[in-house]
Amino acid sequence: MNLDALQQRLGYRFSKPELLQQALTHRSHSAQHNERLEFLGDSVLNCAVADMLFGMFGKLDEGDLSRVRANLVKQQALYEIAQMLQLSEVLRLGEGELKSGGFRRPSILADALEAIVGAVFLDAGFEAARTLIRKLYIPILEQVDPRTLGKDAKTLLQEYLQGHKIALPQYNVIATHGAAHSQQFEVECMVPKLEVRVFGTGASRRAAEQAAAKLALDEVQKLVPQLLKRSRAERTGKTRKQPVPPDPQLSLRLKE
């Protein structure tokens, strides 16, 4: 297995290439697989990401830091990084796993990425692993808003409305469709002050509410700036000095 291209993409060259090979080996392939390295890499990754967030976002509290970290190290995030590194091309899978498309499976790719982090840690220590993690994550962090990352649509809508002193939205189930085992819920979300009324659907009430909240948030974010602009214009008009009307009696005296 030629791993030069992968090491180039990682920006790290192993002094013990067998560690990288083991990190890419699924348990379906051989007894010398990557699960122990994955365990180690998971801990190293969490520590390095926590350290990075602590240094980058000095104004975030403990709860927000935990939320952001959880979203950066969850399976989907790791899977996307693994895809960027093209790990599916170099995974070592057993024949059955290979035939079933294991090289595309998010869990397998995410685990392999954690195992690579563990392998780098064993190969050269924590600083080398932290350098790799920073290289992988800094481009991601430059594109996300840590204040909203990981928050669902209902939470974002509620926080946005509260920030502008607007009453919270109202959610109502207006219809359900389908058999009991495959129901679809339809929910309306209303923000009366802004005359917003949208509808969302989902396989559960919660999912439908989230879908409706996302649509409502899009509408609210368009309307609130217009409302604020109009409010400022009205305040400016009221405070602008009005011309003093002429005194009719003074006009008569001047004519005399």
From Swiss-Prot:
Residues 229-256 are annotated as: Disordered. The keyword RNA-binding applies. It catalyses: Endonucleolytic cleavage to 5'-phosphomonoester. It is an enzyme of class 3 (hydrolase). One of its GO terms (biological process) is rRNA processing. Residues 3-125 form the RNase III domain. Residues 152-222 form the DRBM domain. It comes from the Bacteria. The active site is at residues 42, 114. It is found in: Cytoplasm. Digests double-stranded RNA. Involved in the processing of primary rRNA transcript to yield the immediate precursors to the large and small rRNAs (23S and 16S). Processes some mRNAs, and tRNAs when they are encoded in the rRNA operon. Processes pre-crRNA and tracrRNA of type II CRISPR loci if present in the organism. NCBIfam families: RNaseIII (TIGR02191). This is Ribonuclease 3.
